[in-house]
Amino acid sequence: MKTARRRSRELAVQAVYQSLINRTAAPEIAKNIREMPDFAKADEELFNKLFFGTQTNAADYIQKIRPLLDRDEKDLNPIERAVLLTACHELSAMPETPYPVIINEAIEVTKTFGGTDGHKFVNGILDKLAAQIRPDEPKRR
C-alpha cells in the first residue's frame, strides 16, 4: 500500500514531467493533478512543496545535477529528469527528511514510471548529489 507521502512524490514527479514536456504553467498543471483520483490519498502540503519548489529552483538544480551525469543532459529520459529535479529539491529544501529516505523514494518512483534500469541511474546520481548537498549527514551503512 502506498503512503500519502509516496503518492505526493509520484504526483509531484508527474507534474514536473508535464512541465518539462508541455511547457504548461505550474498553476494549471497543479490544478490538473489535483483533479486526479489519486490526489485525494496524497499529502497536499508535500505535493505543493515538492512541485512548486522544484519549479522555482529547477535551473539551479540542473546545474547541480549536470556534472554528475554520464551522458549529455539532452539525452536524459524526461522521467529520470523529473525524478532527479524533484529529489534534488527535497534534498536541498527539506532537511527533516533523511537523504536515504529521499533516495529510496526516488528509486521507487522511477521504478513505477521510468525505464527498465532507470532506477539504477537515478540511485547513482542521487548518492553523489546527497554527498554534495548534505555532506554532514551521517552516511548509510
UniProtKB/Swiss-Prot annotation:
Record GO terms (molecular function): RNA binding
GO annotation, biological process: DNA-templated transcription termination; transcription antitermination
Source domain of life: Bacteria
GO-annotated cellular components: cytosol
Pfam families the record matches: NusB
General function of this protein: Involved in transcription antitermination. Required for transcription of ribosomal RNA (rRNA) genes. Binds specifically to the boxA antiterminator sequence of the ribosomal RNA (rrn) operons.
Name of the featured protein: Transcription antitermination protein NusB
Source organism of this protein record: Neisseria meningitidis serogroup C / serotype 2a (strain ATCC 700532 / DSM 15464 / FAM18)
